C-alpha cells in the first residue's frame, strides 16, 4: 500500500504547472507548446507509473486513498481514491489530453491562455474521476464549465458566442439539479452534513426521496452525456469549437456524464436505478435511432459527426440500464472506445476543414486524391465508428447487445423489440457515415477551385492518428485488455441489486 499522495499530485500538477505558462516569454509560441506537451507527458507518465506499481488490478475496492481536512467548519474533506471503474477513464483522459495539446499546435492567438485552459480542464477531469467526496465531485464537475466556455467563445467559429452561451446555459442549468441532489443527499438523516461516498453507499432513503434524488442527478448527467432531449447544445458546440477542443469534448467530457450515472446514480441509489432502468433502456434505443436519422439529414459534416456521437451514447445508456455484468462492462468498453474514435473523427474533420475552409457536404468532393492520408485515416476511423469487426466499436456494441439479451430484468418481447431497434440503428450508422465519405472524398468538384490549400497530413498529424489507431485495433482484437480492469468491480457493484 502506497501512502504517497499520487492522486493529489495528478490533480494539482496540470493546473499549477499551467499557471506558470503566463511567466514564459511572450515572443513566439514554440516554448509554450513544448512546455504544455512536456507537462501532459509528465502527467501521463506519472499516472502510468502510479497505476502500474501501486494499484492492484485484482482488488475491486478503492485504492490509493487520500483523506485530508479541507473546509474544517463544515467538516468537508479532500477525499480521493480510485477503483477499476475510474482507472480506465483516468488513463483515457491522460492519453486524449496529451494528444489534444499536440493537435492544438497551429493555435497561435493567445496561445498561453489557450494551453492554460486545456491544462485546467485536465485537472478537473482527473479530479472528477478520482473524487471520493460528493462535494469534491461537484466542484470538479463545475471546474470544466469555465475553461470550455472560454475555449469555445475565444477560439471557435463564426457562431462561437451562440454555441458557447448555449453550452453554458444547458450545463449550468443541469448543475443546479446536481447541487440540489448533493445537498439533499448530504443533509438527509443527519445533523452533520456528510458527503463521503463510502458512507453514502450504505445510506438508505425512502423510495420517494430516492427517486427525487435520482431524477435530479439524472438531469445533470443527461446534459453532459447527452441524453435526448437535452442534447441540442452538442451539435452547435462541435460545429464551432476548435478541433483540439472537440477532442476533449467528445473524448472525455461526454464520458463524465456516463461515469456520474454509474458512480452516483447506480452505486448510491440502487433502488431508484432499478425502477428507472427500463426507461433508460427505452431512451437509449430511441436515442440511437433518432440521432442516427438526424445525422443523415445534416449538411454540415461536423454536425453529422456530432449526432453520430449522440447515437453512440445510446449504447452506453442501454448498457447501464441493463443491470447485468455483461451490459455494464459493455457500457464501460463503449465509453473508452468512443473516447478514442469520437475524438479522432473530430480531429480529422477539423484538419480537413482547415485545409478546405468548407463544412457543407454539397460543396465538397474529390479530396481523396490531393489528401490521400486524411482520406485513409478518415475512412479507417469511420469503419471503427460503424462497428467494423476487429475494431473496438464492434466489440463494445456486441457486448451491450449480449448484456441486454441476458438481462433478467426484462421480459422476452421487450428485449426483442429493443434489440430490433438497436439493430436498425446499427444499419443507419454506415448509411450516414459512408454517404459522408462519398460526398467529401469522391468526385471531382474541388479540383478546379482556386486558392485551396490541398496539403495532406504531416508527420505530427500522422503520429497522433497512429497513436489512437493502435488502441482501437488492440481493443477490437483483444477486448480483455479493458474488460479485465472492470469485471470484478462491476460484479461487486451489481451485488447490491441481487441482494436487495
Curated annotation (Swiss-Prot):
NCBIfam families linked to this entry: NDH_I_M (TIGR01972)
Cellular localisation: Plastid, Chloroplast thylakoid membrane
UniProt KW Glycoprotein keyword: no
HAMAP family with a match to the protein in the record: NDH1_NuoM (MF_00491)
InterPro entries given in the database record: NADH_Q_OxRdtase_chain4, NADH_Q_OxRdtase_chainM/4, NADH_UbQ_OxRdtase, ND/Mrp_TM
Keyword Lipid metabolism in annotation: no
Coiled coil (residue ranges): none
Record GO biological process: aerobic respiration; ATP synthesis coupled electron transport; electron transport coupled proton transport
PANTHER family linked to this entry: NAD(P)H-QUINONE OXIDOREDUCTASE CHAIN 4, CHLOROPLASTIC, NADH-UBIQUINONE OXIDOREDUCTASE CHAIN 4
Gene: ndhD
Entry EC number(s): 7.1.1.-
Bilayer topology term: Multi-pass membrane protein
Root EC class: translocase
Entry's transmembrane regions: 4-24, 35-55, 87-107, 111-131, 134-154, 167-187, 211-231, 242-262, 272-292, 313-333, 334-354, 386-406, 417-437, 462-482
Keywords: Chloroplast, Membrane, NAD, NADP, Plastid, Plastoquinone, Quinone, Thylakoid, Translocase, Transmembrane, Transmembrane helix
Record's protein name: NAD(P)H-quinone oxidoreductase chain 4, chloroplastic
GO cellular component: chloroplast thylakoid membrane
Swiss-Prot/TrEMBL catalytic activity: a plastoquinone + NADH + (n+1) H(+)(in) = a plastoquinol + NAD(+) + n H(+)(out); a plastoquinone + NADPH + (n+1) H(+)(in) = a plastoquinol + NADP(+) + n H(+)(out)
Molecular function as annotated in GO: NADH dehydrogenase (ubiquinone) activity; ubiquinone binding
Family classification: Belongs to the complex I subunit 4 family.
Amino acid at each position: 500500500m502506497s501512502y504517497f499522495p499520487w492522486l493529489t499530485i495528478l490533480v494539482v500538477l496540470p493546473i499549477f504547472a499551467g499557471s506558470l505558462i503566463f511567466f514564459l516569454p511572450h515572443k513566439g509560441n514554440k516554448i509554450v507548446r513544448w512546455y504544455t506537451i512536456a507537462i501532459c507527458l509528465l502527467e501521463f507518465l506519472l499516472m502510468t507509473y502510479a497505476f502500474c506499481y501501486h494499484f492492484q488490478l485484482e482488488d475491486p475496492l478503492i485504492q490509493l486513498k487520500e483523506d485530508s481536512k479541507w473546509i474544517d467548519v463544515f467538516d468537508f474533506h479532500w477525499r480521493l481514491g480510485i477503483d477499476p471503474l475510474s482507472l480506465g477513464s483516468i488513463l483515457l483522459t491522460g492519453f486524449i489530453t496529451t494528444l489534444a495539446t499536440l493537435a492544438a499546435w497551429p493555435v497561435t492567438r493567445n496561445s498561453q491562455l489557450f494551453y492554460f485552459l486545456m491544462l485546467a480542464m485536465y485537472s478537473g477531469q482527473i479530479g472528477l474521476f478520482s473524487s471520493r467526496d460528493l462535494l469534491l465531485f461537484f466542484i470538479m464537475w463545475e471546474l470544466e464549465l469555465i475553461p470550455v466556455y472560454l475555449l469555445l467563445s475565444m477560439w471557435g467559429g463564426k457562431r462561437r458566442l451562440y454555441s458557447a452561451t448555449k453550452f453554458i446555459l444547458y450545463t449550468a442549468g443541469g448543475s443546479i439539479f446536481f447541487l440540489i441532489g448533493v445537498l439533499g443527499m448530504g443533509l438527509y438523516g443527519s445533523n452533520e452534513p456528510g458527503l463521503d461516498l463510502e458512507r453514502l453507499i450504505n445510506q438508505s432513503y425512502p423510495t420517494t426521496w430516492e427517486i427525487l434524488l435520482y431524477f435530479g442527478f439524472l438531469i445533470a448527467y443527461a446534459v453532459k452525456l447527452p441524453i435526448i432531449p437535452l442534447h441540442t447544445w452538442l451539435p452547435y458546440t462541435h460545429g464551432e469549437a476548435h478541433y483540439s477542443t472537440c477532442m476533449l469534448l467528445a473524448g472525455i467530457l461526454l464520458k463524465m456524464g456516463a461515469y456520474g450515472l454509474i458512480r452516483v446514480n447506480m452505486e448510491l441509489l440502487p433502488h431508484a436505478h432499478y425502477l428507472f432502468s427500463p426507461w433508460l433502456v427505452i431512451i437509449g434505443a430511441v436515442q440511437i435511432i433518432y440521432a442516427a436519422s438526424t445525422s443523415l439529414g445534416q449538411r454540415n459534416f461536423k454536425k453529422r459527426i456530432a449526432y453520430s456521437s449522440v447515437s453512440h451514447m445510446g449504447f452506453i445508456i442501454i448498457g447501464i440500464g441493463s443491470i447485468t455484468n455483461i451490459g455494464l462492462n459493455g457500457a464501460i468498453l463503449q465509453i473508452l472506445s468512443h473516447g478514442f474514435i469520437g475524438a479522432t473523427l473530430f480531429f480529422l474533420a477539423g484538419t480537413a476543414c482547415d485545409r478546405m475552409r468548407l463544412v457543407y457536404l454539397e460543396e465538397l468532393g474529390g479530396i481523396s486524391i490531393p489528401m490521400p492520408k486524411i482520406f485513409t485515416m478518415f475512412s479507417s476511423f469511420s469503419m471503427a465508428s460503424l462497428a467494423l469487426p476487429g475494431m473496438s466499436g464492434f466489440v463494445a456494441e456486441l457486448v451491450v447487445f449480449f448484456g441486454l439479451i441476458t438481462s433478467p430484468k426484462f421480459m422476452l418481447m421487450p428485449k426483442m423489440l429493443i434489440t430490433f431497434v438497436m439493430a436498425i440503428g446499427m444499419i443507419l450508422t454506415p448509411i450516414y457515415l459512408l454517404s459522408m465519405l462519398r460526398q467529401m472524398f469522391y468526385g471531382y468538384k474541388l479540383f478546379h477551385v482556386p486558392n485551396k490549400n490541398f496539403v495532406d497530413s504531416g508527420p505530427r498529424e500522422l503520429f497522433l492518428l497512429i497513436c489512437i489507431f493502435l488502441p482501437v485495433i488492440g481493443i477490437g482484437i483483444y477486448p480483455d485488455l479493458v474488460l479485465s480492469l472492470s469485471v470484478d468491480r462491476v460484479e461487486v457493484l451489481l451485488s447490491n441489486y441481487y441482494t436487495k
